[in-house]
């Protein structure tokens, strides 16, 4: 049996763990709190901060694992892959240097510029408030202001959304320069965002089905940005507003990225996630993530037909082949504590009827919750509906939520026809009429 160490204890990692066990792995987990879903399927469980590299390596050596699979971004930034590889333990996940695609936004933008990656945005990095203000005034169009490190997607502010105008953008950018020493300013791109995740063996990429995330806290895409309140994917692995040509361009961006990383001496092995904006001119890369999306990992792993252990071994050995996914639609809805993300309640027990959820045909994924169903303050559970069409998948996920009771909060509109029509409408306003893909 292949012994696999999984680092991380969120919903994404529960989905990864289930896929590894289904592929025949003997699973070992290290995370800062015990995920009840992972605890049920793991041979052993080590409690430690995922960024405590020495501790992670210690567990890996104690359990004599064959390889590691890294779930979240923080341990990648901490260099957990480098440390494991130094001890002869291969990993699915990029080294600290390769993970800069996510962990250092300025480096990533400069890398894209150096290598002429298609779909890149206009950007500037500033450490001088005066220069920054002059540039924004001269640019004269709406901008996006981004902090440079890992922010869990929460520090990015866009003119016309979180910022009233470029004047407010200058104030926020100045605050970030004072706080972090630097700030990243980009042109604003209008359109609809989508997620394109690929497996990478260092030289080539293999695509997964596209997904679309719902980052805003509240229905109708308003409110603060969260880690993601849910996501959907379509049975044809595209999205209703994406053409085959858009898909090919986005894939080219990711393939060229991996080729350029190899050329620069940082072979990228693991999962690469491109967050794209579909603009009127085609897909623009908003940012990279150096790991699976959470929730989008749950969508794609729910319909993975091939064996994740074998895929992982091929990533490590550098000989990836195409990967098969079933032609099913998926809807993932996250359940969070009331008050999330700004002021979530914690320490309260909720009722979860797992048998009834299964009877609805849904899967239950555990995240920030303990084995007594006590809320730990972040997204707690995800319910997953899988069916031949999106309506049916959404119904399954929605009906499962009835069997979770307590001070919870979720978005009813994730994966609904209305919410998707809204996105199609945005694209039609930018591109004119087009043939919509069925989902």
UniProtKB/Swiss-Prot annotation:
ATP binds at residues 136-195. The keyword RNA-binding does not apply. Mn(2+) 2 binds at residues 287, 289. The keyword Chaperone does not apply. It is an enzyme of class 6 (ligase). Its EC number is 6.3.4.13. Mg(2+) 1 binds at residues 275, 287. Keywords: ATP-binding, Ligase, Magnesium, Manganese, Metal-binding, Nucleotide-binding, Purine biosynthesis. One of its GO terms (molecular function) is metal ion binding. SUPFAM superfamilies: Glutathione synthetase ATP-binding domain-like, PreATP-grasp domain, Rudiment single hybrid motif. Its cofactor is Mg(2+); Mn(2+). SMART domains: GARS_A, GARS_C. GO terms for biological process: 'de novo' IMP biosynthetic process; purine nucleobase biosynthetic process. Pfam families: GARS_A, GARS_C, GARS_N. Pathway: Purine metabolism; IMP biosynthesis via de novo pathway; N(1)-(5-phospho-D-ribosyl)glycinamide from 5-phospho-alpha-D-ribose 1-diphosphate: step 2/2. It catalyses: 5-phospho-beta-D-ribosylamine + glycine + ATP = N(1)-(5-phospho-beta-D-ribosyl)glycinamide + ADP + phosphate + H(+). Belongs to the GARS family. This is Phosphoribosylamine--glycine ligase. It comes from Pyrococcus furiosus (strain ATCC 43587 / DSM 3638 / JCM 8422 / Vc1).
């Amino acid at each position: 049996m292949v012994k696999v160490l999984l680092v991380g204890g969120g919903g994404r990692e529960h989905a990864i763990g289930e896929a590894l066990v289904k592929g025949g792995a003997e699973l070992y987990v290290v995370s800062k709190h015990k995920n009840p879903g992972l605890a049920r399927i793991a041979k052993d469980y080590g409690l430690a901060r995922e960024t405590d590299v020495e501790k992670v390596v210690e567990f890996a050596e104690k359990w004599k694992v064959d390889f590691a699979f890294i779930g979240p971004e923080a341990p990648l930034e901490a260099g957990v892959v480098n440390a494991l590889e130094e001890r002869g333990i291969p990993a699915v996940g990029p080294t600290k240097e390769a993970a800069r695609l996510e962990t250092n936004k300025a480096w990533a933008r400069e890398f894209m510029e150096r290598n002429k990656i298609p779909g890149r945005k206009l950007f500037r990095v500033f450490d001088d408030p005066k220069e920054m203000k002059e540039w924004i005034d001269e640019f004269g169009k709406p901008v996006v202001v981004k902090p440079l490190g890992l922010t869990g997607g929460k520090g990015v502010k866009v003119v016309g959304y979180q910022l009233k105008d470029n004047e407010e953008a200058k104030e926020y950018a100045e605050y970030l320069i004072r706080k972090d020493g630097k700030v990243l300013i980009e042109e604003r791109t209008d359109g609809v965002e989508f997620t394109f995740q690929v497996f990478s063996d260092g030289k080539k990429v293999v695509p997964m089905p596209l997904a679309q995330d719902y980052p805003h806290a509240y229905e109708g895409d308003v409110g603060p940005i969260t880690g993601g309140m849910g996501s959907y994917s379509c049975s044809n692995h595209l999205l209703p507003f994406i053409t085959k040509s858009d898909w090919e361009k986005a894939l080219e961006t990711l393939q060229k990225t991996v080729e350029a990383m190899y050329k620069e001496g940082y072979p990228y092995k693991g999962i690469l996630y491109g967050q794209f904006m579909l603009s009127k001119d085609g897909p623009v890369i908003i940012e990279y993530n150096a790991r699976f999306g959470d929730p989008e990992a749950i969508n794609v792993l729910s319909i993975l037909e091939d064996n994740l252990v074998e895929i992982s071994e091929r990533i490590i050995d550098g000989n990836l082949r195409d990967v098969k996914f079933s032609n099913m639609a998926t809807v993932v809805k996250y359940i969070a504590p009331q008050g999330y993300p700004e002021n979530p309640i914690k320490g309260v027990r909720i009722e979860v009827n797992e048998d009834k959820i299964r009877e609805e045909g849904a899967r239950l994924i555990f995240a920030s919750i303990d084995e007594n169903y006590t809320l730990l303050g972040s997204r707690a559970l995800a319910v997953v509906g899988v069916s031949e069409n999106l309506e049916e998948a959404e119904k399954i996920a929605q009906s499962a939520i009835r069997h979770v009771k307590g001070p919870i909060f979720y978005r009813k509109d994730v994966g609904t026809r209305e919410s998707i029509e809204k996105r199609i409408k945005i694209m039609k306003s930018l591109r004119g009429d087009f043939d919509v893909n069925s989902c």
